Amino acid sequence: IIICIFLLTLCPLVTLQADDLTQTVSIVPCPVQMVSGTGHFRFSGGTTLVVENAEQAKVVRNFINLFTKAAGFTPVLKTGKMKGDVRFVTDKSLKSEAYRLDIIPEQITVRASDVKGFFYALQTIRQLLPPDIENHHTVNALWTVPCLSIQDEPRFGYRGLMLDVSRFFLPKEYVLRIIDCMAMLKVNKLHFHLVDDNGWRLEIKKYPRLTEVGAWRVDHTDVPFHSRRNPLPGEPTPIGGFYTQEDIREIVAYANARGIMVVPEIDMPAHFAAAQAAYPWLACRELEREVPGYFGGRVPTLHGIRDWNRSACLGKESTFQFIFDVIDEVCELFDAPYFHIGGDEAPKDEWKKCPHCQAKMKEMHLNDVEELQGWFNNRVLEYVKQKGKRLIGWNEILAAGNLDPSVIGQYWTPKRDKNVERHIARGGDVILSNHRSFYFDMTYGQYPLSYTYDFDPGRYHISPRSYDHVLGVEAEVWTEWIDKRPKLDLNVYPRMQALAEVAWSAEERKKYADFKERLEAFKPTLDALGIGYAVTSVAEPGTFQRQKPRRLFYCGDTHYELKLNEERKAKGEK
């Protein structure tokens, strides 16, 4: 027995045999501790799930709906202290989000201290069921789970995925599908990048031109992102879309029901070109312009100018009134305690020449344009704080010496940033999103799957003694190089599974070879969900095989890996 327990604790991928039934125990992310039992528990229409209260019932109802769709029967849900086949028991000795799961042939017992823990226990049971549980049509199967005991809790409280819908707009239904997969993998924060140079994606009732103008651009999808030309005046703008405020309420409610917090990002003061196309007075130079199809500040105007005039003018009070009005409406829609302002890659040359910005610097006794942005960030922070929110920004904002230390810095840059270290030393908090491990827009030739799985905070000079100031990790799905949903699926899966394990599983439990085996067992679940993914040879190419996709990407062929993946899947590769 001791040997069995030892093997299961170290090797989460285990095949159990009982009553002529063979099932593989394969859970992503890997639990903290798992011990095998004997036999299996079977779900049926007569299975009774007993909860203690309405809050638990709400979580369990979504789990029961899986059986209604895929199995053709609906287990019974009851509230109270009666006997049941699946019992939910509050145990205040467990941490928030932690759970204990005990499965024997006659009963399943789920223990947690809060509804989050109960939810994550159900996601583990969901993965223990046959993959057909994810189908939306009735399947004839044995709906069983193996007997075992699990004790589990997350490594980080903040386990995030950022979705850039500015560069490549995603319909609401696709966002909901991503939320479903995040929930199954215990990823609990959706960072919604709603605004950038290339599109404003959120309805703001006080400023209708943000979506009438700012949400649409010229169709350049047949041209590599970095080769796109300036739009011409009056050229049709069919590419884009936006979310109505009702759409956002639906997305937030759907996510909340699945244990996911939606964190809005309104990028400011840079990456503001779409807003300036709608309202030119937001810029230092009030030129008419179109929504660009490119990034990096090559902002086209009606005068044929390509310049860096994409930062909001920080010297005009009208800019702040606009921003505060937008914040008011955004905070009514999102209940997260965070508000992300981006703040990265802010071109500052305009501020050096702008009479409004220079007058403001003189008035506020600011030494340079870095301090001007720091002053801007602090002013927005104070407004956001009044709304009960905490400000998040990319780590470039930490360069300002006058920044309020309550800001959360999101550390994305590939190299060591001493401003991050200084921020932590002052008691500031950070989220780790380092480029090498967590930029899912990159090809696998550039950053193979192992780069995500092998993430190590120490590589970025985050020492263990600073971990109290690390809220968690987040991966970024930028979409400059993504213009098809199959391409997005390819880039995200199986990287999201690796992200989940980095964010949830204890460091000593992680073993890449074991993860790859469990990943293979997870792929039928993705198939059942209709989600595309990179096959093994694409996600983890050899050193020589990495060269071609990387070279072609830099030459503008962003679809090479997608085509290669489709060819290999057609040949039966997983």
Task: Indicate residue ranges for each PLM-predicted region.
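Active-site neighborhood of glycoside hydrolase catalytic domains
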Residues: A275, P300-H303, D307-S406, T413-R422
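Bacterial Sec-dependent signal peptides at the C-terminal "C-region" and cleavage site
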Residues: L10-L21
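Flexible loop/turn segments at secondary-structure boundaries
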Residues: A57-K58, F169-P171, D197-E203, P269-A275, ...
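Bacterial N-terminal signal peptides
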Residues: I2-P12
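Flexible, acidic glycine-rich loops studded with aromatic residues
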Residues: L391-V407, T413-K574
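Contiguous, structured surface segment used for ligand recognition
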Residues: D19-F156, K487, V502-T536, L552
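Feature activates predominantly on carbohydrate-active enzymes
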Residues: L94-Q321, D325-Y338, C354, R379, ...
